[in-house]
């Protein structure tokens, strides 16, 4: 089945501590999660490793978020939207359900 949310899509968070925030999808995981730029930041404590050149400390990075908790952002309407699929010229394309425009 084709993915409704893909890498480089702009999404909006629907639930959780970052509700209402927007960001670009950097990774889509096979477990049904996505990593969004600047969303769901967690602090990770790392040990120094001189062999790898890693300095120790507290690093802030993005954690994965469930794909059901984000929706694709429609720039035409300025709101979250749903995605559908249809065939155009023999190719499967994604479109916004609210206005029928193609995604990207």
Swiss-Prot record:
Descriptive protein name: Large ribosomal subunit protein uL24
Alphabetical UniProt keywords: Ribonucleoprotein, Ribosomal protein, RNA-binding, rRNA-binding
Any one annotated GO CC term: ribonucleoprotein complex
MF terms in GO: rRNA binding; structural constituent of ribosome
Biological-process GO terms, alphabetical: translation
Family as reported in the entry's similarity comment: Belongs to the universal ribosomal protein uL24 family.
Top-rank taxon: Bacteria
Subunit architecture: Part of the 50S ribosomal subunit.
Organism: Shewanella amazonensis (strain ATCC BAA-1098 / SB2B)
